[in-house]
From Swiss-Prot:
The name this protein goes by in its record: UPF0242 protein CCA_01002
Family to which this protein belongs: Belongs to the UPF0242 family.
Endpoints of the signal sequence: none
Length: 401
């Protein structure tokens, strides 16, 4: 019996639903068997609406019954609890525990909501952190690149600074050198200005001296004509004394040259650095050459043994021989046809002693003519270590006609 009750009791609970279900399914079952003219949907629609209303009313009734049963149960429990002190305390404790459980559940829900919020914030923060880490890594790479560029620029800047310092030092040296040059140029300009003043004075003296020399030349020409007439006769009588006389006259001329007023030094560089001297070396040599041109002793010349060339010769070389002094000294046996070895040896004056001798020269216009020569060394003056020499024909009448 209990088994039957246990099995059929749940089924009996839903007996109220049997009629609406049958009312709903019966038209559906009979619908295929009806003809087209007999198909009337009004019954079908009515059955559906009535079934729906029945379901609604049944559900509402069950809900009311459940609420009434619950209230009745609560009332009975409350009465039982009120009668029994132990149960009342248990109920109170249960209610407290339920309240606490409800509070804990609400707190748990709040914490769960907060946890979800924190989790969402954490996930968002984590995403932001990852994004920031990526940005930091990118910035770190850019920083490394910028650091490398900065190191390169710093190295280049140091090199430029060193180069600038080097250029500054070179500029300072150049400015110092330029200052020294300016001072030297200023001193040279002052000295050259003084030299020009001295030259102007000397030119003025030369102009007055030229006028005097013109008069002397006319007198010398007259004396030369007299000497041409008288000297040959004296030469034939005293032919052995003529070289000695030439050497004596040559020594007088050498004495004048050695003791002429010269510069304090024999080089142009020393002359420029001298402050007390105002005479130019070349100007003094020119003055000496002008004085030597006034001498009428014979073919007078000045020879430099080191350079093996003549630095001066008067015009008688061209007049008597027809050759210039360079042609005469360099032609060798073509012009000096006799006494050439002794002449070349004596011309060097290795022992710095006077020399005299005789050579035969082949002139252009007068044939072969013998000449006496005398040589002496200049020991001081602007032309020191130069050879002063003179050549004079044995017979001066060979040039007449």
């Amino acid at each position: 019996m209990s088994f039957v009750k246990k099995k059929f009791h749940p089924i009996s609970r839903y007996y109220n639903y049997l009629f609406p279900i049958a009312a709903f399914l019966l038209p559906l079952i009979c619908l295929p068997f009806l003809s087209a003219s007999q198909k009337n949907y009004s019954y079908f629609i009515f059955s559906i609406i009535s079934a729906v209303g029945w379901f609604f009313s049944i559900g509402l009734r069950e809900k009311q019954l459940k609420m009434a049963a619950g209230q009745l149960l609560q009332t009975k429990i409350r009465k039982i609890v009120e009668k029994d002190e132990g149960l009342r305390k248990i109920c109170e404790s249960v209610e407290e525990r339920q309240y606490e459980s409800q509070q804990l559940r609400s707190q748990n829900q709040k914490l769960l909501n907060q946890l979800l919020h924190v989790r969402s914030v954490f996930m968002k923060t984590k995403a932001d952190t990852q994004r920031m880490e990526g940005a930091i890594a990118h910035l770190r790479e850019e920083n490394q690149c910028l650091q490398l560029q900065l190191d390169a620029l710093s190295q280049e800047c140091r090199e430029k600074e060193e180069e600038a310092q080097q250029l500054n030092r070179e500029l300072a040296d150049a400015l110092a050198y330029q200052q020294v040059l300016n001072e030297e140029y200023q001193a040279t300009f002052t000295e050259q200005h003084n030299m020009l003043d001295v030259r102007q004075v000397y030119i003025g003296k030369l102009e007055s001296k030229v006028q005097d020399l013109m008069c002397e030349i006319r007198n010398l020409l007259q004396l030369e004509s007299n000497m041409v007439d008288s000297f040959p006769r004296q030469a034939t009588v005293n032919s052995q004394e003529q070289p000695k006389q030439l050497l004596s006259e040559l020594k007088k001329i050498a004495f004048k040259v050695e003791n002429a007023e010269a510069a304090s030094s024999l080089t142009a560089s020393r002359y420029i650095r001298s402050e007390s001297s105002v005479h130019n070396y070349s100007l003094e040599c020119r003055q000496l050459f002008d004085n030597l041109r006034e001498e009428s002793l014979g073919m007078l010349f000045v020879y430099a043994p080191q350079s093996q060339r003549a630095v001066f010769a008067n015009s008688l070389f061209k007049t008597w021989t027809g050759y210039g002094v360079e042609d005469f000294l360099n032609a060798g046996g073509d012009i000096v046809i006799s006494g050439l070895p002794q002449w070349e040896t004596d011309l060097r004056l290795l022992d710095r002693k006077e020399r005299s001798g005789k050579i035969i020269i082949k002139t252009k216009n007068h044939g072969q003519i013998p000449f006496y020569y005398c040589l002496t060394i200049l020991n001081k003056g602007p032309l020191h270590n130069h050879v002063l020499g003179v050549l004079y024909p044995v017979r001066i009448d060979a040039f007449r006609g």
